[in-house]
Amino acid sequence: MREVLEKQGLRFGAFMAPYHANLNKSVHLALHRDLDLVEHLDRLGYDEAWIGEHHSAGVEVIASPEIFIAAAAERTKHIRFGTGVISLPYHNPLMTADRIIQLDHQTRGRVMFGFGPGALPSDVHMIGRAQTELRTNVMQGFDALLPLLRGETVSMKTDHWELKDARCHILPYTRPHPQIFMSSAVSPGGPRIAGTYGLGLLSATTSSDAAFNALQAAYDIWNDAARQNGQTINRADWRVVGNFHIAETREQARANVRHGLGQWLDYFQRVATFPVAKPGAHAATLDEQIDAMIAQHTVIGTPDDLIARIDKLWEQSNGGFGAILDCAHNWADYPATKRHYELIAEYVIPHIQRMNDARGRSWDWAEANHLSGMEERNKGVAQEFALWEQQRKAAEIASR
């Protein structure tokens, strides 16, 4: 029987690579604004923030999600953090396991471990690796890392690292270990690996036709792999990432993204390899780019537009997912970006989670009984006046 979630249980978060595509702006200020944004999300009641790892091209400027999360956790109270994602082929698995365990303790269990093969070819080149090795490398790393997180001893050798009687000298705060997620974009490889190991699934983009269409089959691939390997998965452990910017009006949203959308598209056309923009998009006018992106499953509009988009993603997933993550792309300037997240918290989250249903029912009930209530109130007031008059007359008689 296919598992189906209730949409009102959907959680909300941000997926922060993050993107800072204007190379003329201060990266120092950008990093501190990223920390401030996480504080803002925490105050607004968001559930999660996922932080990326990148090492080249000057746009996705966080090299260590663990360092960023450690700082952000000290500034926040409730929001949970995910590594989105750690590129396992770049690291010795013992060092990665140790850092995640330490972070699990420092955050008192507010960390989730997302991993993948690495996204930027320039990163891979700089450490002397080949793109064709990455899928094998990431699973070699995970096969060593998972038992390390469980407190087991590992001896293992690959072409890039060796472990001899390796063990983590402290156990995780979260038992048996923090929740683990495998990243996925379009291919079936991510869901298949996640299912094989019983992991959560992080669908890192839904902003192209291919990625949107892949949602339809992702759960079945994930679930089939889990069943074939004696694992159990849960739709609540599925994260879906989308590209959104909302404002009070569609016109305002389009005006807001003029701040940085063009540079962001240039990055994906000229440098990065993620399928978020069609070839030649940078040659179009900005309005044409915006129209094309809206047609390609992006929201640049109002809270109602985003609600409709989430409904479509939910339908496409054939049963729902646990959290929707808004990609922190910095298309708008910082005040408009913060307002975007406020509008989601003010209007989109309450609608999806049906926070105000009870308020609406209470209003309807009170309205339906308004006239009878007024009659009863007037009777009560009249009774008080009559009692007061009775007492006044009794006092007059007594004083004679």
Language-model-detected regions and their locations in the chain:
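N-terminal beta1-alpha1-beta2 module of alpha/beta enzyme domains
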Residues: 1-81, 177-178, 363-364, 397-398
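Flexible, glycine-rich active-site loops centered on histidine and acidic residues
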Residues: 7-29, 89-160, 200-203, 207-213, ...
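Hydrophobic faces of well-ordered beta-strands that scaffold small-molecule active sites
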Residues: 12-16, 49-51, 81-84, 111-115, ...
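Acidic (Asp/Glu)-rich catalytic clusters
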Residues: 4-7, 42-43, 69-78, 100, ...
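An alpha-helical appendage that flanks or caps ligand/catalytic pockets
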Residues: 1-8, 134-168, 210-323, 339, ...
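Active-site mouth loops of central-metabolism enzymes
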Residues: 18-32, 86-94, 174-186, 245-247, ...
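Conserved, mostly hydrophobic/aromatic
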Residues: 12, 41, 45, 53, ...
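Glycine-rich, proline-tolerant flexible connector loops at the mouths of alpha/beta enzymes
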Residues: 48-72, 87, 119, 206-210, ...
